[in-house]
Amino acid sequence: MSNYKTVFFTLGILQIILGIFMLIPIFVQFFFNEIDSSFFGASIITIIFGTLFFLSNLDHDKKLNLQQAFLLTALSWLSIAIFGSLPLIFSEVNFSFTNAFFESMSGITTTGSTIIPNLEEMPKAILLWRAILQWLGGIGIIVMAITLMPIMNVGGMQLFKISNSDSSEKILPKSKEIALRLIYIYSGLTALCAMSYKILGMNTFDSITHSMTTIATGGFSNYNESIGFFDSVYIEISAMIFIILGSLPFIAYIKFLNGNRRIFFSDIQIRTFLKIILISILILSIYLFLDKSSELNFRTVLFNVISILTGTGYVNAQFDNWGGFPLIIFIGLMFIGGCAGSTTCGIKIFRFQILYSFVLNQLRKIIYPKGIFVLKYNQSPVDDKFTASIISFIYMYLVIFFAITALLSLTGLDFITSISGAATSISNVGPGLGSTIGPNGNFYQLPDVSKWILSTGMILGRLELFAILVLFLPSFWRS
């Protein structure tokens, strides 16, 4: 176990931090006179376990090798989901372990699926804790995507190694400094979002919790009707702006602050992300114009395209009733996802860009067999091994999606619930389709085994598949 001292030392720190965050809802309990011992007890247990891990591994190696990085990534999310479920289990609401773990995993992976049937009846402390989990999950995935994933060579993420920044730019600071700057930017955007919500009519509690789940593109709300509860076009506009800000690569914010004022216009991933939003809105608007019987309107089209593409999962309408064509568009948007290095999920735009260029080059080679075609991304050549990694990722993404769909159907779920549940879990979106898990539904009525399958899909999708799958290879443990 000495090889893994660094892993458990870091896990100890993360658990102590999580335990400290558990103390925050206690102040809300006092304010709303909902006092119980659930959060205090959960905090003490979490901090004790974290302290034991921390103190028993003080002699750890200061460096983290590749094997340890994979193990730390998987155990971090799993342990936070487990300990994050404790306040729910200890609460007077009496969550079962399955339901509490599902809600916690949905929170920390910023999925946004919920097993709570009546959110309005929940204690404020639990609503705040759900928001905190999503907020922590959002910043956690940003830091991991920028500092760990490129080193781990997962699904083409090595394209975003910090050392590969453009030579015309200043050399970026080291990983620790980058992580701190990311936290400052993330916190600043959250504060701005909260202020905008407050100004536009939300009460203080709602503005704080919704700002946390907006920037994290998580989608947890305090109401069954989600953001539609407020029935405010101005709140929805504010939400869309901050969802988009949370969906951009956070390294771009650092580059912007370092002096690259054109980064948001020059980055091909950002440009494509915005084009997908505009094209999707245009297609659905044309459909809206031609199909007079549709319940669509431009406001709901605009909001739900942005919400679904980014994996946020906020809804302002029951999009189950919009007909088959819009639902096909939305399922496609679920798979596409947002930008790498942001809080969003899905396959990610850069992978589709490279896959498109790869297919285009293959077609050119058919026409010009002797031609030499170099695949490029953001004006830089892309090595064949990166392309192979991306193709492998997309292949496994689809395989796991169909596997989850099949497993869910074996638990007795209907086809629509199974296929949309698989899509929303692996893409970390939140709502599915159908009368049970649709936009204003929840996952409470699903069998426990279905919830465990979906929870597995959530962590697989959040951690880019291979960061989990590699742990099941015997050769990984022998390396």
Please describe what each predicted stretch is:
Residues 1-479:
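Membrane-proximal intracellular helices of multi-pass ion channels
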